[in-house]
Amino acid sequence: MSLLRRKQPDDQPIASVALPQCTPIAETQPRQHVWVKGKVIRMTARPTSGQPALAISISDDTGTVTAVWTGRREIGGVTLGRKIAIDGVPFMHGDHLEFTNPGYTLLPK
């Protein structure tokens, strides 16, 4: 598995990218690799151990998860209302699931 974050090549239309089977957020289990997709409903910049971190909340019809990218204040193309798919291994953070530095794919608007 590559440690690099996946981005779509500039010459490949996003709509042509095939995603693996996405799991509904409500069915996502901690410590199991999954793909989830939904709409960005909240974005905050929050420092973690003195480093910048971007946190976004992603919601589908079944629930909400949080994704945090450490060392980032923003990610190009990630805006409120944008559809996004993320993949990674979520962990429980308090009472909700959180992905740390997940891979992501921006979906058509």
Predicted regions, residues:
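Short nucleic-acid-contacting surface segments enriched for D/E, G, S/T with interspersed K/R
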Residues: Q29, R72-D87
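Hydrophobic core residues within well-ordered beta-strands of beta-rich domains
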Residues: V34-V36, L54, I84
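A short acidic, glycine/proline-enriched capping/turn motif at secondary-structure boundaries
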Residues: G63-V65, R72-E74, F91
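Residue-level recognition of conserved beta-strand positions in structured domain cores
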Residues: V68-W69, N101
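OB-fold (S1/OB) nucleic-acid-binding surfaces
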Residues: M43, P47-A67
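OB/S1-fold single-stranded nucleic-acid-binding modules
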Residues: M1-K37, I41-S49, M92, L97-K109
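Residue-level recognition of well-ordered beta-strand positions that form the cores
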Residues: K37-I41, S57-S59, D87-V89
